[in-house]
Amino acid sequence: MFNTNDRVVDICMGISFFIAFMYGAIMMFDSTFLIDRYDNPASNPDTQTISIFMFWLGAANIGAAFGVIYMGYKGLDRAYFAYAVPLLFFFIIWNIAPAQASGNYTGIVLLSISLVALIIARSRSGFPSNPFDIPKADKYFGTDDMITKVLLFLGLIGQGFNVIYYFVRPDAIIEDTPVLAMSVEAQQFATAMMLLSLAWVISLLYQMRAGLSMTMISVGLLISTIYFVGMINYMITSGGAGGNPLIGISFTFFFVGSVIVFFRNQSKA
């Protein structure tokens, strides 16, 4: 697996997969399991808001787990580590406040284990030990396909906008989405969504220099598909009431763009 005979790499990537898949499945299909352990009903009696945020973050975890499966067949991909390692580090820091408030440090421990596992796997992968020693492709994103370049640039701009706009209006995603209710916990999850966008910015900047990664394109396609299907399901079941048009447009463009980029570059998969 992973185009390596190193059993340590296999074990470390397996650990990372298990933790990502476990959290993804729980967040998407049984969010109350985590809400009961971290949420404070006194300050946030509305668990629907947290469930929506958990669905979004759960999709990101499922995407990360799928990336490990993809690399199991195709080999380790440096672009995946450029995405997953910063994301895990961000989420460990992000988990400190909820852990202190609830006294439950399980999340920090598991994320730390996953981070260490990825670092060990990367260190034994044969990649340059210096993570900033990034090979430079002949062209942006390493491709002559202008449509692919434009879509990836738009993705970079969109994710960068999410990060910048968070610092301008930290509560915008909550205030502009009627179905979401304001609370301390909701604000913390809004921060988590910004950190997810920041990890994507790092990954896209890496790919812009080193060349596009079919691992990350596949990860993005899976996440965007889950977001898009979830959005359609919400529109059907609720009639669209309480939604955020900007989020809907973003999810749609994310999905359509991911599909186009994937199929225009599938020969590299």
Residue locations for each model-derived region?
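Membrane-interfacial, low-structure loops and terminal tails that flank and connect transmembrane helices
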Residues: M1-F2, G126-I147
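Membrane-interfacial loop-to-transmembrane alpha-helix junctions, especially the N-terminal start
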Residues: V9-M13, G75-P86, T148-L152, L212-I223
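Alpha-helical transmembrane segments of multi-pass integral membrane proteins
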Residues: V9-M28, S114-A117, T143-V168, G257
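Core segments of alpha-helical transmembrane spans in multipass integral membrane proteins
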Residues: F18-M22, Q48-G72, I157-F161, V184-R209, ...
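Perimembrane loop-to-helix junctions flanking transmembrane segments
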Residues: D36-T49, E175-E185
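Hydrophobic alpha-helical membrane segments
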Residues: Y80-I96, L196-S203, I217-Y234, T252-G257
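Membrane-helix boundary connector in multi-pass membrane proteins
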Residues: I92-G107, F228-I247
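Membrane-water interface at the C-terminal end of transmembrane alpha helices
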Residues: S114-I134, F253-A269
